[in-house]
């Protein structure tokens, strides 16, 4: 009996080794292993190589686990049944004692295997998968060498089955931006990343999805010089709007000639020279980009052209607005470079906000914790969302209810939504419900 118990313990140890090996190899993170391999850890590289082709490894593990389970059942019955039978035979019939001994012996062996050969080693492997994998890789390589004939045989059968059912035989481990975002989110929840670091990484990915109109200065807010503008008017504009660059156009903003740098104008003032644009002022070529460009592509355009300022045009060659390198960096860095600028979203209290109509829809989603706006590809700003939902040029008091919020137009500037009042009306998302002012509302407002 003692020999049988020792055999059972050895089988449990072997099964625990295979269980721990299986879960540790599957749970080991490639990024961490690659860092260790780059530092010269040979075992880390061996684990990576085995992860690339895990078929032989898992075949050996399954052969080992199944063989141990069968042997455990055979030896376990022989180890404990006689002892239980001799104990119970004193108090009951031999037939009943034999049946009860078998049940208890089976339960004891099964419980020992579940606890010590499966649950415990697998939990250890899940807690520290890389550390365990580095320690078991060499013994597993020896097992692979010893069991090579069996591995070839069973792997060949498995490959035939995979080909018959046209199943993929290699795992795809391409890392996507969603995978990185999930890791970052987990790091933020665990407290590893600070709030600013988390937001910065989120903003990096937004550069790929947000187009230039979401961060531009719209055309109605662009300060530009007419080629034939008088000198006093130019001085007044520079004094009132101290920008570093000014567009130069011919009669209207859609006929761009170039731009002038404020430093050039300052040098002419210091030299007592005229500021008139047709009197020798250097007019530089303007970088022009389409409105379909993403912010990351705009950064690349700035780098290629050696500029920090660009005009955005649509498909009809009409100026949509302008964007600067600072606009892109403000989107990327958020409050770190945006301090001192006029806030587009102002919280009145915990349940209401005043939002500028030109605020990018992504910023509104972040502040209000809204997952997605309907058909957001059709607009870039919260004002565009209102026009899209109302299906008309909005007027004051027009409103839309969405995602538990009421979006109400409170100010219009030349047909453009200048400000919205957003009020939380419900903690749960609600269906889209545009509301237009009717006769009854007008009567009540007059009263």
From Swiss-Prot:
Every CBS domain range = 216-275, 282-343
User: According to its UniProt record, what is one Pfam family this protein matches?
Assistant: CNNM
Cell compartments where the protein resides: Cell inner membrane
Membrane topology, as annotated: Multi-pass membrane protein
What is a single molecular function from GO for this protein? flavin adenine dinucleotide binding
Principal cellular location given in the protein's record: membrane
Stretches assigned to the Cytoplasmic side: 1-4, 76-99, 163-447
Q: Where is the CNNM transmembrane domain?
A: 1-197
Q: Does the keyword Membrane apply?
A: yes
Asked if the Swiss-Prot or TrEMBL record annotates the protein with the keyword Membrane, the reply is yes
Keyword line: CBS domain, Cell inner membrane, Cell membrane, Membrane, Repeat, Transmembrane, Transmembrane helix, Transport
Q: Where are the transmembrane segments?
A: 5-25, 55-75, 100-120, 142-162
Please indicate the ranges of residues that lie on the Periplasmic side. 26-54, 121-141
Upon gene disruption, the observed phenotype is: Deletion of the gene results in increased sensitivity to cadaverine and putrescine, but not to spermidine and spermine.
Q: Which GO terms describe its cellular component?
A: plasma membrane
Family membership noted in the UniProt record: Belongs to the UPF0053 family. PaeA subfamily.
Q: What is this protein called?
A: Polyamine export protein
Species of origin: Escherichia coli (strain K12)
Q: What is the lineage of its organism?
A: Bacteria, Pseudomonadati, Pseudomonadota, Gammaproteobacteria, Enterobacterales
